[in-house]
């Protein structure tokens, strides 16, 4: 039987989105390694990273390498942070959930030193080198999404995709030959089965006989497919992405500054998730039959380790005695990642209980740990910066950053669909940062800052919809069907700095960051029709998601020794 997907709100290019094999990557893998937050020294974070034209700060140098040319002496900086992360979800204004945890680490270390004598009046040139490590992004958080009577189930989504593939059940149930890993897991785990009279059309296994005493109890005309009474998604994420910079730069006549950076990153990420749906069917009283009770569980575990390499270039110029302007470019980052993952599916109904009357799984299907390696190109970005002096009492700074998230690319396999999704559905992401530093008295500084980034979502299909209902078919990452779409990130910060003794300084900052996101338990899908008859063999579905905000409150401290 040949089939085609009837595309309703979906793009034609998403024909096979979501139909993934066990080792498939998805746009979520690219986006996860592109996520940002306020980072670096306490001085920079106190100004919300609006430091591209500031210079003479290790994080300012990471934004614009030309800033290294302002250094006249050597310095070593250590940075620490401790914070609280809280994720809150709201499903259809009916069901909410909060989860939180404490985090903290050594998040910055740098050394910078001139390699030419900055005090030689016979030369207008200065050359400076430096190296730094910064925690670029922390993944640590837990979140939970609860739904009440969602319109569609995960089993319906998987049945739709298995039908679109059109693989006979003898092929689908064989892990070694199946073209659809999640469908194989679901078929062997009791989530889906073949529709009566077909061997390649699939339906959910969560159904009940309308008349339990009918001669053909499970004839299609006597079966009702159940909708979930409730859904619950639990996710725990851990890990971080760190950045290592090796910079050389300098200045000419204290008017023009230049620099270049070799940049590497390392990433360690771990994720565990469980999505459960509960079903219930009440028979008519005259049947005197026990009610039908089901629940299904899809569990996934994923760990990823890898890194990238790239470069950064910057220029900066003094504008008289008024301030400075600068521009910098980060090249695309090229990376390689290794992952280990496993999946478990369990299907329960009240035909099996233990001695305590608790439901036990009637079907269980799980995998051993599986491994995979893939390559990834992350987008480059451009930053324009400006700084204006406030007499001798401080400065105001502004940074504008632009990058094209749609230029990210998965490599090392057949990622045509995923890369097409990235190209068509992600686009320009813009970040605005503004900072203030004032010096009321010598040796003491007050700082404040604000930053805002949009989510870089281009397609209407993945942009916010009324009620957080999404019919769009984004790509599931293997058996991980849930995904988070970020709409914005903003931070507000305040800080102080003071001279402790000699040329040693202490900087402190408070940073409040908020990520506004939407979380979905599975994608939407278009209906599937038999090409020859035009009969709908799998209905289209939508996914009902929840609004989620992740708020991080952090205290940052940096200690700098100059010599």
Predicted features and spans:
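Hydrophobic alpha-helical membrane context
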Residues: 16-17, 69, 76, 519
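Outer-membrane beta-barrel porins/channels
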Residues: 25-39, 44, 114-563
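Bacterial Sec-dependent N-terminal signal peptides
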Residues: 1-28
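Residue-level detector of alpha-helical transmembrane segments in integral membrane proteins
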Residues: 2-3, 7-9, 58, 372, ...
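Outer-membrane beta-barrel translocator/receptor signature
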Residues: 42, 54-63, 69-150, 242
């Amino acid at each position: 039987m040949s089939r085609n997907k009837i595309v309703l709100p979906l793009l034609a290019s998403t024909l096979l989105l979501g139909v993934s094999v066990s080792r498939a990557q998805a746009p979520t893998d690219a986006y996860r390694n592109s996520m940002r937050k306020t980072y670096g020294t306490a001085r920079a974070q106190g100004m919300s990273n609006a430091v591209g034209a500031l210079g003479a700060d290790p994080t300012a140098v990471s934004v614009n390498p030309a800033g290294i040319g302002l250094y006249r002496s050597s310095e070593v900086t250590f940075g620490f942070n401790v914070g609280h992360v809280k994720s809150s979800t709201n499903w259809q204004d009916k069901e909410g959930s909060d989860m939180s945890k404490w985090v903290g680490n050594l998040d910055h270390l740098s050394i910078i030193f001139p390699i030419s004598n900055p005090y030689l009046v016979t030369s207008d040139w200065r050359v400076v080198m430096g190296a730094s490590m910064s925690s670029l992004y922390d993944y640590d958080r837990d979140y939970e999404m609860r739904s009440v009577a969602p319109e569609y189930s995960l089993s319906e989504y998987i049945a739709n995709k298995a039908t679109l593939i059109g693989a006979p059940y003898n092929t689908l149930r064989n892990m070694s030959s199946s073209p659809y890993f999640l469908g194989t897991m679901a078929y062997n785990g009791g989530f889906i089965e073949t529709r009566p009279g077909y061997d390649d059309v699939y339906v959910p296994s969560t159904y009940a006989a309308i008349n339990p005493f009918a001669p053909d109890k499970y004839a299609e005309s006597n079966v009702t497919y159940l909708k979930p009474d409730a859904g619950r998604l639990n996710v725990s994420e851990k890990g971080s992405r760190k950045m290592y910079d090796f910079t050389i730069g300098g200045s000419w006549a204290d008017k023009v500054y230049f620099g270049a950076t070799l940049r590497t990153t390392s990433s360690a990420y771990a994720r565990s998730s469980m999505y459960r749906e509960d079903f219930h069917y009440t028979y008519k009283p005259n049947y005197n039959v026990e009610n039908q009770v089901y629940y299904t569980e899809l569990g996934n575990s994923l760990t990823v380790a890898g890194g990238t390499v790239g470069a950064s270039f910057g220029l900066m110029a003094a504008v008289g005695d008024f301030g400075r302007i600068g521009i910098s470019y980060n090249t695309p980052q090229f990376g390689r990642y290794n992952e280990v993952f496993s999946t478990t599916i369990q299907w329960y109904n009240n035909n099996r209980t233990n001695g305590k009357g608790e439901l036990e799984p009637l079907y269980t299907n799980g995998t051993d740990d599986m491994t995979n390696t893939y390559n990834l190109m992350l987008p480059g970005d451009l930053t324009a910066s400006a700084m204006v002096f406030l007499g001798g009492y401080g400065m105001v700074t502004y940074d504008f950053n632009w990058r094209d998230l749609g230029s990210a690319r998965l490599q090392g396999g057949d990622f045509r669909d995923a890369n097409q999704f990235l190209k068509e559905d992600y686009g320009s992401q813009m970040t605005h940062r503004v900072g203030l530093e004032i010096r009321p008295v010598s040796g003491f500084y007050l700082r404040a800052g604000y930053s805002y980034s949009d989510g870089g979502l281009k397609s209407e299909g993945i942009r916010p919809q009324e009620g957080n209902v999404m019919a769009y078919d984004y790509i599931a990452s293997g058996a991980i069907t849930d995904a988070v779409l970020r709409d914005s990130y903003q931070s507000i910060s305040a800080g102080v700095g003071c001279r402790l003794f000699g040329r040693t300084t202490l900087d402190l900052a408070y940073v409040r960051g908020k990520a506004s996101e939407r979380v979905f338990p599975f994608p939407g899908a278009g209906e599937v029709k038999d090409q020859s008859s035009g009969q709908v063999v799998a209905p289209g579905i939508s996914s009902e998601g929840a609004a989620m905000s992740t708020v991080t409150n952090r205290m940052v401290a940096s200690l700098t020794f100059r010599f």
